[in-house]
């Protein structure tokens, strides 16, 4: 294992990733931009902690972001996403591309950390200094993606990873958030879902750029492919030149992986040729700024108001139902 790569299989809060046991708060932007995994892992940890050193480090590296291709992978629990990702990493490495992974898990109700689960299957890549894997908890964003996920992706981008994969468990409405982060979104399904696939949200079908039927050696895989293709054709956007492919894979045997990566890379090329790659980056950055403004403004408003008599009166009136939440929010925005 390279000296810069420090990986723990299970720290006290349940994470896996590089730099987890490093408690130093010193951030070295130069090392991060050189791809130092310990320095990068440290910055991600500090950003998770909302530490001033982390924010300062992020500011120092931001101008070096916007180059990585971001691939989002989502799907129901048990669909073999982590095994699929492990083989996708290997295929990208065969093509001499550096790969970063942010694996998003639901937060543990006891520790707030990320569940290890099948992520240990990715450990085969931990001795490769061209791969960086970070498992992160959603911290209250069940099935969705927290602010620190976005920050971690940008850190890996600045570190020089050609591809950054976001893997998230596909549960709840927030699973569509992955399209806000990723240039290309791969939706993973498996045979045997039966009528459940019919209830798949239209929004999820709309965000998918590539559809994968994993565990295709099971009975019903051809039916699953046909069903997905039919649903996609019915919901096809006429002006969209990209036609999402539906591919079969057997991840545990490594079958169909090269074809999947080919399809993903074809979508990347489509985005580059159409100008949508840069447009996505602009939109994603604006969404990030908007979320920060909302967060910072709310913090500032409540910090300024919390000790005032007017704020206590407002809380009392709200509790007694003398005013409604909308009116209370309007008063806070106006400075009470």
Where are these regions (language model features)?
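Long, well-ordered amphipathic alpha-helical subdomains in the mid-to-C-terminal portions
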Residues: 248, 259-336
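Conserved C-terminal guanine-recognition region of P-loop GTPase G domains, centered on the G4
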Residues: 172-182, 189-239
């Amino acid at each position: 294992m390279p000296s810069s790569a420090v990986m723990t299989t299970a720290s006290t809060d349940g994470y896996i990733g590089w730099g987890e046991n490093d408690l130093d708060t010193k951030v070295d932007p130069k090392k991060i931009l050189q791809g130092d995994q310990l320095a990068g892992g440290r910055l991600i940890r500090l950003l998770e902690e909302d530490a001033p050193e982390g924010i300062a480090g992020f500011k120092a590296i931001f101008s070096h972001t916007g180059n990585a291709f971001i691939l989002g992978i989502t799907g129901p629990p048990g669909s073999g996403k982590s095994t699929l990702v492990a083989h996708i990493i290997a295929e990208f490495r065969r093509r001499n591309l550096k790969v970063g992974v942010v694996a998003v898990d639901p937060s543990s109700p006891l520790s707030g950390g990320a569940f290890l689960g099948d992520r240990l299957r990715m450990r085969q890549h931990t001795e490769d200094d061209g791969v960086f894997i970070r498992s992160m908890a959603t911290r209250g964003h069940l099935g969705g993606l927290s602010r620190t996920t976005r920050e971690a992706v940008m850190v890996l981008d600045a570190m020089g990873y050609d591809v950054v994969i976001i893997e998230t468990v596909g549960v709840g409405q927030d699973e569509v958030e992955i399209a806000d982060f990723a240039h290309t979104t791969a939706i993973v399904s498996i045979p045997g879902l039966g009528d459940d696939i019919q209830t798949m949200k239209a929004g999820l079908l709309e965000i998918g750029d590539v559809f994968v039927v994993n565990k295709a050696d099971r009975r019903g895989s051809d039916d699953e492919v046909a069903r997905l293709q039919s649903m996609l054709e019915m919901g096809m956007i006429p002006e969209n030149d990209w036609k999402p492919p539906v591919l079969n894979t057997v991840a545990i045997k490594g079958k169909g992986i090269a074809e999947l990566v080919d399809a993903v890379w074809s979508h990347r090329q489509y985005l580059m040729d159409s100008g949508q790659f840069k447009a996505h980056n602009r939109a994603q950055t604006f969404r990030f700024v908007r979320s920060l403004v909302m967060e910072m403004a709310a913090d500032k408003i409540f910090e300024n108001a919390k000790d005032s008599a007017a704020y206590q009166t407002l809380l009392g009136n709200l509790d007694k139902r003398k005013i409604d939440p909308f009116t209370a929010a309007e008063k806070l925005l106006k400075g009470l």
